[in-house]
Amino acid sequence: MSKATISDVARKVGVSESTVSRFISGYKVRNAKRISRAIKDLDYRPNIVARNLKTGRTGLIAVVVPDITNPFFASLVRGAEIAAGDEYMIQLINTGDDLEREKWALKRMIGRVDGVIYVPLQESSEAISNKSLGSLPLVFVDRVLTKSNGFDSVLADNCQGGFLAASHLIELGHRAIAFISGPLSSTPGRERAIGFNKALAERGIVQNSQYFRESDFTSLGGYQAMSGLLSLKVRPTAVFIANNLMTIGALKALKEHRISVPEDMAVIGFDDHEISDLIDPPLTVISRDAHLQGALAMATLLERIRGINQFPPKQIKVDVNLVVRKSCGSTCHHRSNEEAKFEDTLSALTLT
């Protein structure tokens, strides 16, 4: 049996070859269901190389992430992959938290891919510019650059996440609250800190400066930051940790120091994962939908590639929510109001 051609599909449905071609390229056309059925019945397989030569496209979309071992980025890539469907293949580039590798990778992508979904390492990164990219479509996800007004972005509501975490701990009676932050040079690190500090300020709580630890979004960084907190003469009674990998490291440090969660210290992490429910005790977290962020980024990018979206760049915000489990306990039962007032005063004195 000879191999089916695009002409065979068009003849079976009763449409032009150009209509079938547009359908295969992802455009909305009439008789889409009939075309899809005919392609399946005839086992038609488009010649991708020939099609790309004709359209001037590569059929590839690059997804650039800083650390693929982070479950959040793995889920984000999967969401983008599903949204791309059969039209595009994903070229995954893991920069390994290396700025030089990030610059190298972005330069090599020009002319090799049809678009880029990009998670930059730092807001101040100079790896890209409108001039260097030319007309290559790009969508930021999770993080943006300070000079990125010309590009679309899909971001979680990080400020709200930091605010929800701090507010929950305050409502449980905590006042000596520590914060293990990601790099303040990154969008999520900076915005989660803004939300956290806003919640404390609204309730008149002055944070001991020693309770703030800027880290690097890695497990080792979380371990080192928590170890530093545990070395203090007056330890915090609660901690918000600004990403999943740092939370793993921080929990390891707590275990090594025989600190009981939540009896000795309440813990809130950022990003939900299957293991969050398996940790003992199950982890309270700020949750966001990584699949959705990846899918929205891909959908936005495809609109740009196809020329459907001619509007100015847009920023899409994805909601976050607090998932309460058992790592914070029900109340800060081990501290009286008098003790809380004393620790607030002590924290204020430490700042002077």
Can you say where each PLM-predicted feature lies in the sequence?
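N-terminal helix-turn-helix DNA-binding module of bacterial transcription factors
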Residues: 1-57, 351
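An alpha-beta-alpha
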Residues: 163-203, 210, 313-328
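Structural motif
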Residues: 90-110, 162-163, 214-232
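Short, solvent-exposed amphipathic alpha-helices that sit
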Residues: 71-86, 161-165, 187-206, 221, ...
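Flexible loop/hinge segments that line or gate small-molecule binding clefts
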Residues: 97, 118-164, 185, 205-206, ...
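Hydrophobic alpha-helical segments within soluble ligand-binding/sensing domains
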Residues: 154-179, 194, 219-228, 247, ...
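Flexible loop/turn connectors
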Residues: 227-352
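Amphipathic helical "hinge" segments at domain boundaries
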Residues: 44-107, 112-115, 194, 201, ...
